[in-house]
């Protein structure tokens, strides 16, 4: 026959199963058993034609076929012999095919199984037989119709009851993965339940049975939103509608076209259903005019102020409506940036603090994120809550920090309001520890300034300072204390309680590590810089206390200062020159710092201007532990316990531009690889406009010129110099400065311990000064790489810029950076820095190396023979 390309034997078997011809199917499936039967019939006269007529071409084909036909052969649509037999209700043939091993759950190309075919035509006995052989009772076809739905559509009550007793899901939507094995590509099959199919075709008995088994009367199709009650209204089945309402069907349910079952019955002119549903329905049909009028959300999208006003005036509740995304009209107006609409909605009592149901954003957050500054101002004036958090934990202030180029005024505005709110609520009794500090003593937390209007005034002055700085000459260093301060004339608050340690002797050196995490910078002038840094950190934590932000540092709130196009090192320092117009090599080589004089000893001693020291070229003496010994300061020096005279070296003291000075002893201390040190000394109050000095020297104090006040002998005690090959994360003990008794009987000041959180490493004999510039350069690099989350690791391990440029992949793994991609980014940045600035850094390091070599030789010659090095 060859029809459709199927072998003739296949076609014969499928036709036999469709017709219920068990004998032909047996001959085709068991040719060995059929031949003897035919031979036994030959001797009978006249039987052969009858046999041939009965068997027909099937017998001839069976004799021609030498091998048996596969029991699971199928036609072009994938229908098997078992499916044909089940659809026809031929129970003996179905039983025979199952004994021959036919697959009970095989599907055709449309996802239909043999059980579906039996249920479709209501063959209870065949369905029972298939279920006994393991047929899937919850199978679905490619359209999403289940076996129960197929049976309910046909109104076959017996099959429906059999399927329910066999465990069929009454609403068939419980298993989530049923249609995965059907070969279909539709993500959303028709969501028609058995109850809906029975109602649509008017099978009340099946509806009653399904309702008794717990069918959901309010299950609506996702695509059109139709409920079973709407289908009953469509078909005009009053009895079915009454059953549904008795079981809890909602008559006010709306379809996607916003129609109720009452409107469906009205449209279909089913008067009995209209009369029945009318008193039950509270959602009344809209007039044609109402249907043509756009809702308030559409009016807002069009920007039609007059239409929004009319809608709000007609029904004030519309201003707080919620759309499908959980958003209110005020949120939509805040996104579009239309201030007039925002004002109108707020005047109509729109809830300014309402959060959407999807992300938890408020109108203030939307306006902030989209940069609508005027709307932010207006909402804040209307009392919008800045402390509300979205579902991801962000506040409005946090969102503005995430913008690539946030508006400075917007940042100031939100920050000031956040601080004011926290000030009104009262600051917490204890502050959380900063990420970079593992150990923080209670006395090490600076007090927030309360002068000139409190935090808000302080933030305004700080923001004004941002505006005065030039963009091209500013590194991303946060509030580096070597910049001129516009409010430096303020008296510095005494921080004795926070910055002074108790008097110590030589044996108290073991207590230094506990004090090390107090501040990042040392020197008595660094107290102001530390106070600013901690103040800003505290302010950000109070204003936006979200710890999941990329960083809690101030750098996140300096939007005008964009990072440079490439990694620039020392660019700020190279641009500075001396007053006489001549470039100062020491300024070029070393990051700039500022120092504040602290006269001690004689109470009325005035500090003299401190100027850079010009050193003669002296031969270098071998480096030894003697260089770390005790120094007897020159009798020409005066000015307190830590005053060091340098005039005998031939150095001339000159005043530096901008009030920023480099103290040479800080470089000596840095080369000795002293561990983190903080010079804690009683700060003196002076009105000289000199910025705070975040230095790394234990002796960063000004020296008076020769001929000053009477000399005061002091004893400088330092620990033994560590080997030059110390790692970048050295934890060596900090050197200690212990003043000896004054010859004039003056009470000695409290001993000062030197400890800095910047543990400096030395490369090629040079050193990097422990200024805040190094840290903020490193911070800027991490920010540009979007790796701010690793900043606490570098701060905890005290990796400065010099050490950062020498890190390897193994070092990064030891630091705790486990992600390969992050390590590759950091290594690429290090390579770029070293490649682009290699020559310049080499010159810098050679300059520092020569400077230290010269000064070490000079310093070692100035020691008095009576002093022996410390043990």
Swiss-Prot record:
Gene Ontology cellular-component terms listed: ciliary inversin compartment; cytoplasm
Record field: compositional bias (Low complexity): 43-54, 627-647, 687-699, 721-739, 750-770
Pfam families: Ank, Ank_2, SAM_1
Coiled-coil annotated residue ranges, if any: none
UniProt subcellular location: Cell projection, Cilium; Cytoplasm
Residue ranges with Basic and acidic residues bias: 571-585
Post-translational modification 3-hydroxyasparagine, affected residues: 138
Main location: other
Keywords, comma-separated and alphabetical: ANK repeat, Cell projection, Ciliopathy, Cilium, Cytoplasm, Disease variant, Hydroxylation, Joubert syndrome, Nephronophthisis, Phosphoprotein, Repeat
ANK repeat residue intervals: 8-37, 77-106, 110-139, 143-172, 190-219, 224-253, 257-289, 291-321, 325-354, 359-388, 392-423
Disease: Nephronophthisis 16: A form of nephronophthisis, a chronic tubulo-interstitial nephritis that progresses to end-stage renal failure. Some patients have cystic kidneys of normal size and no extrarenal manifestations, whereas others have enlarged renal size and severe extrarenal defects, including hypertrophic obstructive cardiomyopathy, aortic stenosis, pulmonary stenosis, patent ductus arteriosus, situs inversus, and periportal liver fibrosis.
PANTHER family: MASK PROTEIN, PROTEIN KINASE DOMAIN-CONTAINING PROTEIN
Name of this protein: Ankyrin repeat and SAM domain-containing protein 6
Organism, as annotated: Homo sapiens (Human)
């Amino acid at each position: 026959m060859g029809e459709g390309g199927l072998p003739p034997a296949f076609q014969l078997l499928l036709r036999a199963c469709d017709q219920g011809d068990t004998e032909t199917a047996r001959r085709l499936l068991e040719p060995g058993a059929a031949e003897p039967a035919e031979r036994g019939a030959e001797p009978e006269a006249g039987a052969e034609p009858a046999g041939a007529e009965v068997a027909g071409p099937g017998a001839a084909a069976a004799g021609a076929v030498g091998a048996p036909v596969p029991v699971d052969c199928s036609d072009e649509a994938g229908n098997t012999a078992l499916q044909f037999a089940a659809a026809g209700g031929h129970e003996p043939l179905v039983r025979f095919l199952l004994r021959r091993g036919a697959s009970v759950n095989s599907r055709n190309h449309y996802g239909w199984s043999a059980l579906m075919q039996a249920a479709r035509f209501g063959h209870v006995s065949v369905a029972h037989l298939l279920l006994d052989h393991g047929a899937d009772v919850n199978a679905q076809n490619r359209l999403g119709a289940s076996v129960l739905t197929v049976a309910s559509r046909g109104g076959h009550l017996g099959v429906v009851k059999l399927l329910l007793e066999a465990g069929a899901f009454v609403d068939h939507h419980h298993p989530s993965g049923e249609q995965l094995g059907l070969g279909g590509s539709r993500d959303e099959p028709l969501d028609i339940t058995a109850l809906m199919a029975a109602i649509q075709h008017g099978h009340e008995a099946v509806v009653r049975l399904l309702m008794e088994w717990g069918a959901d009367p309010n299950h609506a199709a996702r695509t059109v939103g139709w409920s079973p009650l709407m289908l009953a209204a469509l078909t005009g089945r009053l009895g079915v509608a009454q059953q549904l309402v008795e079981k809890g069907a909602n008559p006010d349910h709306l379809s996607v076209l916003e129609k109720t079952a009452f409107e469906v019955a009205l449209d279909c002119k089913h008067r009995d259903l209209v009369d029945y549903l009318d008193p039950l329905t509270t959602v009344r049909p809209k007039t044609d005019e109402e249907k043509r009028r756009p809702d308030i959300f559409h009016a807002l999208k069009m920007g039609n102020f007059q239409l929004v006003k009319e809608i709000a005036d007609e029904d004030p509740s519309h201003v707080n409506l919620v759309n499908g995304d959980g958003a209110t009209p005020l949120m939509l107006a805040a996104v579009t940036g239309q201030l007039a609409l925002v004002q109108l909605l707020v005047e109509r009592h729109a809830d300014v603090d309402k959060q959407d149901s999807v992300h938890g954003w408020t109108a203030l957050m939307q306006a902030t994120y989209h940069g609508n500054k005027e709307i932010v101002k207006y909402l804040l004036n209307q009392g919008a809550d800045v402390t509300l958090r979205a579902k991801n934990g962000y506040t409005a202030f946090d969102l503005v920090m995430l913008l690539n180029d946030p508006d400075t005024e917007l940042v100031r505005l939100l920050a000031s309001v956040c601080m004011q709110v926290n000030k009104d609520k009262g600051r917490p009794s204890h502050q959380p520890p900063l990420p970079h500090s593992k150990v923080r003593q209670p006395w090490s937390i600076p007090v927030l300034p309360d002068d000139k209007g409190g935090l808000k005034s302080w933030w305004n002055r700080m923001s004004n300072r941002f505006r005065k700085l030039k963009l091209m000459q500013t590194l991303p260093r946060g509030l580096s204390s070597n910049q001129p301060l516009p409010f430096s004339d303020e008296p510095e608050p005494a921080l004795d309680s926070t910055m002074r340690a108790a008097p110590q002797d030589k044996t108290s050196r073991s207590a230094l590590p506990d004090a090390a995490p107090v501040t990042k910078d040392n020197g008595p002038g660094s107290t102001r810089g530390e106070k600013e840094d901690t103040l800003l950190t505290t302010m950000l934590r109070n204003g936006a206390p979200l710890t999941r932000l990329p960083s809690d540092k101030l750098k996140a709130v300096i939007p005008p200062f964009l990072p440079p196009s490439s990694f620039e090192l020392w660019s700020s320092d190279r641009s500075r020159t001396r007053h006489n117009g001549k470039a100062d090599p020491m300024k070029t080589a070393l990051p700039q710092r500022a120092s504040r004089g602290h006269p001690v000893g004689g109470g009325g001693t005035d500090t003299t201007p401190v100027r850079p020291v010009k050193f003669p070229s002296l031969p270098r003496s071998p480096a030894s532990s003697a260089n770390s010994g005790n120094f007897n300061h020159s009798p020409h020096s005066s000015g307190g316990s830590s005053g060091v005279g340098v005039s005998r070296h031939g150095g001339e003291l000159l005043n530096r531009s901008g009030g920023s000075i480099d103290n040479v002893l800080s470089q000596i201390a840095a080369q000795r690889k002293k561990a983190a040190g903080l010079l804690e000394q009683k700060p003196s109050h002076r009105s000289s406009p000199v910025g705070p000095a975040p230095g790394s020297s234990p002796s960063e104090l000004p020296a008076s010129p020769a001929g000053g006040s009477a000399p005061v002998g002091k004893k400088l005690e330092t620990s033994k110099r560590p080997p030059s090959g110390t790692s970048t994360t050295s934890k060596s003990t900090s050197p200690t400065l212990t003043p000896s008794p004054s010859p004039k009987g003056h009470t000695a000041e409290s001993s000062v311990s030197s400890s800095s959180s910047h543990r400096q490493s030395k490369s090629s004999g040079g050193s990097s000064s422990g200024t805040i510039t190094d840290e903020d350069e490193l911070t800027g690099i991490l920010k540009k790489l979007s790796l701010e989350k690793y900043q606490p690791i570098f701060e905890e391990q005290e990796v400065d810029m010099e050490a950062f440029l020498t890190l390897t992949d193994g070092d990064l793994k030891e630091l705790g950076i486990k992600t390969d991609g992050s390590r590759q980014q950091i290594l690429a940045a290090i390579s770029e820095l070293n490649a682009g600035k290699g020559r310049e850094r080499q010159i810098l390091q050679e300059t520092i190396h020569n400077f230290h070599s010269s000064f070490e030789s000079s310093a070692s010659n100035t020691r008095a023979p009576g002093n022996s090095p410390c043990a």
